[in-house]
A protein has these predicted regions:
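Selective for proline/serine-rich intrinsically disordered segments
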Residues: 25-28, 199
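Short coil/turn segments at secondary-structure boundaries
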Residues: 26, 219-225, 371-373
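Flexible, low-complexity linker and terminal segments
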Residues: 1-8, 12, 17, 130-348, ...
């Protein structure tokens, strides 16, 4: 059945279709709706954890018991969950384990603009990055297969625009693999120094196998264009590039952003008169390409901060490259509304019991230090 779905809802659908049994998450925009949608499936047990570290530990425990599990959080939540993330990279999994982290370029509801791809690189775990709702659903199922085949947790990186945009999803039936029985394996699952030393070579060997997988996986694809110009991109940026250039340039669309596909990148770079990397936030793909000796343009013409858009890319690329200016032409600026839509900054949720406390603290001119976004709103 074809349905119009938010990216987060589609990801929850992918968890259901992929046989997920347990979801443990900590809420935070733009990740929250994944768990809110997953709880609607009777076959999935869902809970909110007291923090992201506990959420990942709960999901990891379910994985050890042989169940396919999931935990979700926003980008800053991965800071809190970093301890178990790095350790379960060494231990590996039993049942498939997905960690969803939702980045927030332009900081619509966040205190920083950190790029979660660095965590996947540092922890040496695979990361998938969908570019629309259909991929969010399919990548969830693919992540479970990768997790169990390579004995690793898998991170799915969402972002605000993918999480909160809608596109068509072809829904399918749930496929639930047999539960893998738990085996007590101290050397694999208890990371004392001696055991961790023995597991580290496994992590390095696994990374090499994942890199080979990335080279041939259908998660990454090449779309050939009519001009000798190539663009390497992923996630939301792919949609902007496609809308601007259509089929006129060749595009390497990356769905697996760690490990990056070395051979595929080198092959794509051949016979290109101009090669660009279009990615929001940090130059992760660009830096890797340059480490391979590939000459690319990226952050020398595109901003390091904020979100991209069709107009922003068209303006920056046209100014930097006359050849692209010819291909781009004029991008319509869009219609102007008779009345501007008022801004909708974050507010306390309806029914929240805490505004009274914040009012009292403010009235008494108290200075209070907090951590999560709700406390930040109290400052207003």
């Amino acid at each position: 059945m074809r349905q119009l779905m938010l990216g987060n809802k589609a990801l929850a659908r992918g968890l259901y279709e992929g046989g997920c049994s347990i979801v443990s998450s900590y809420p935070g925009t733009p990740s929250t709706e994944v768990t809110e949608e997953a709880v609607k499936f009777e076959e999935i047990y869902c809970e909110w954890a007291p923090n992201e570290k506990v959420a990942l530990e709960t999901a990891f425990g379910a994985s050890l018991a042989g169940k396919r599990s999931f935990c979700g959080m926003k980008h800053v939540g991965l800071n809190v969950a970093a301890d178990p993330l790095f350790t379960c990279s060494y231990t590996g999994v039993n049942g498939g384990l997905i960690i969803c982290v939702a980045d927030d370029p332009a900081m619509h509801s966040s205190q920083n603009e950190q790029d979660s791809r660095h965590y996947a690189i540092a922890a040496k775990v695979p990361m998938l990055e969908p570019a629309d709702s259909a991929e969010a659903c399919e990548f969830a199922k693919a992540a479970y297969e990768i997790s169990e085949e390579f004995d690793t947790p898998v991170i799915i990186r969402m972002c605000t625009r993918i999480a909160h945009s809608q596109s068509i999803v072809d829904t399918k039936e749930r496929v639930c693999p047999p539960t893998k029985l738990y085996e007590k394996n101290i050397r694999k699952y208890v990371m004392t120094p001696a055991n961790a030393i023995a597991r580290h070579p496994f992590v390095e060997e696994r990374t090499a196998r994942l890199a080979e997988f990335s080279n041939t996986s259908s998660l990454n694809r090449v779309e050939k264009g009519s001009e000798p110009i190539g663009i390497i991109t992923s996630s939301t940026s792919y949609q902007y590039v496609k809308e601007i250039f259509g089929d006129r340039v060749s595009i390497l669309k990356l769905g697996m952003v760690n490990p990056l596909p070395e051979k595929l990148l080198l092959d794509f770079a051949k016979e290109k008169e101009l090669l660009l990397v279009v990615e929001e936030l940090d130059p992760v793909i660009e830096t890797y390409c340059k480490s391979l000796g590939i000459s690319v343009h990226g952050k020398d013409v595109l901003p390091m901060t904020g979100e991209f858009s069709q107009n922003l890319l068209a303006e920056k690329l046209s100014k930097a490259f006359p050849k692209l200016a010819e291909l781009i032409g004029t991008i319509p600026s869009g219609r102007k509304l008779d009345e501007e839509i008022p801004g909708r900054p974050p507010v306390m949720c309806a029914g929240c019991p805490h505004p009274g406390l914040f009012y009292t603290l403010s009235k008494n001119k108290c200075t209070v230090l907090g951590d999560i976004g709700c406390y930040t709103l109290g400052a207003a």
